[in-house]
């Protein structure tokens, strides 16, 4: 376009530079933008068509991808089941039952048996257990064989059991001592019960002398109440009778007394059958012990002294010039024998226990005492 063709704008002067036009440049830039948008839209449409096509193939064959992955990673293996076993042949029909045959008499069967040949092998020696408690002697030989077999089996089992126990196996160590269970119970009517284990305080009325057996008595010094402490059962002043035996031996310092019966001032009587004890509950009654030393050894000592003095006098009268005295020579055998005999007769004298009247003792109740048959409780 020449300058001549450019129209002259109104209001402009000659030689003045005018404003540049933008129409030509603007139209070219618009075409480029439209072309770019067309290309981008075409690409997007192609991508959408490709996605729809792949999704349709996946829906038509959902296992194709998994099959492809498994085929590419793991080789295909075919497992076949073993053939089924052939059918079992049918069972043959059961044969008809045989007719019952009559049982022959034992004697007839024994007669029909052929005799044994002479070259029969010798029987094994059978262990004779006739003296054993397991052997039962009967008239029938069959019973004897059965008893002998049972005895052998029992002996074998016992030997095996003993072998296991002697070996100290773990099985025997895992079994502890078996103890029986005990069942608890309630005391009946404790208002009239003097329970086992109670101790009655008592003062002796009679002197105890263990030279010979004898009877004894004592007086209760303290009231005894029921097991629950509500009812007075044995009043103070009740009399208890008992007995003792002359059983004191060398080295013993107590005597056993059995208290048999108690009688209250109201006339109530009940059997005790309980042992005597000291005030602290120790078994037996202590007392003064006379060991009878001089009675046991006095005669032997006297005879030995007489023998020694006799030998000394014999040596002095004999005129011996020596000042030494030999007490082991000379006669005196008869005197020694007398001393030994006297010692044998007196060495076994038992000691005697003495316990004076008025001393405090105890009685250990060895059983439950029930006073419900003579006492009753009435409300006030």
Swiss-Prot record:
**Where this protein primarily resides, as one coarse class?**
membrane
Q: Could you tell me the membrane topology recorded for this protein?
A: Single-pass membrane protein
For this protein, the record's InterPro entries field holds: T4SS_VirB10/PtlG, T4SS_VirB10/TraB/TrbI, T4SS_VirB10/TrbI
Keyword check for Ligase, yes or no: no
Region Disordered, residue ranges: 1-26, 78-102
By sequence similarity, the record places it as follows: Belongs to the TrbI/VirB10 family.
By what name is this protein known? Type IV secretion system protein virB10
Q: Which organism is it from?
A: Brucella melitensis biotype 1 (strain ATCC 23456 / CCUG 17765 / NCTC 10094 / 16M)
List the taxonomic lineage.
Bacteria, Pseudomonadati, Pseudomonadota, Alphaproteobacteria, Hyphomicrobiales
């Amino acid at each position: 376009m020449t300058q001549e063709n450019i129209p002259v704008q109104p209001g402009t002067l000659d030689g003045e530079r005018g404003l540049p036009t933008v129409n030509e440049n603007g139209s070219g830039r618009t075409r480029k933008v439209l072309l770019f948008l067309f290309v981008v839209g075409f690409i997007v449409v192609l991508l959408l068509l490709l996605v729809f096509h792949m999704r349709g193939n996946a829906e038509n064959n959902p296992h194709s991808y998994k099959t492809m992955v498994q085929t590419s990673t793991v080789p295909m293996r075919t497992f076949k089941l073993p053939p089924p076993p052939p059918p079992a042949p049918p069972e043959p029909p059961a044969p008809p039952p045989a007719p019952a045959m009559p049982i022959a008499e034992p004697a007839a069967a024994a007669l029909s048996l052929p005799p044994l040949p002479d070259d029969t092998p010798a029987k094994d020696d059978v262990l004779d257990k006739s003296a054993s408690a397991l052997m039962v002697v009967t008239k029938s030989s069959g019973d004897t064989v059965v008893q002998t077999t049972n005895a052998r089996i029992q002996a074998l089992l016992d030997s095996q059991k003993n072998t296991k126990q002697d070996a100290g196996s773990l099985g025997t160590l895992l079994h502890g001592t078996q103890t029986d269970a005990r069942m608890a119970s309630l005391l009946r009517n404790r208002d009239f019960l003097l329970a086992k284990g109670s101790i009655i305080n008592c003062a002796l009325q009679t002197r105890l002398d263990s030279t010979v057996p004898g009877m004894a008595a004592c007086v209760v010094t303290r009231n005894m109440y029921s097991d629950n402490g509500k009812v007075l059962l044995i009043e103070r002043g009740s009399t208890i009778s008992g007995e003792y035996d002359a059983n004191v031996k060398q080295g013993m310092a107590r005597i056993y007394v059995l208290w048999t019966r108690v009688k209250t001032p109201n006339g109530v009587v009940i059997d005790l059958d309980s042992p005597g004890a000291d005030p602290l509950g120790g078994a037996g009654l202590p007392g003064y012990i006379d060991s009878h030393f001089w009675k046991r050894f006095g005669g032997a000592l006297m005879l030995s002294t007489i023998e020694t003095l006799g030998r000394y006098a014999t040596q002095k009268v004999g005129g011996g010039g020596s000042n030494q005295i030999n007490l082991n020579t000379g006669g005196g055998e008869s005197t020694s024998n007398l001393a030994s005999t006297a010692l044998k007769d007196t060495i076994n004298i038992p000691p005697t226990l003495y316990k004076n009247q008025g001393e405090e003792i105890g009685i250990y109740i060895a059983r439950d005492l029930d006073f419900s048959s003579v006492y009753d409780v009435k409300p006030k």
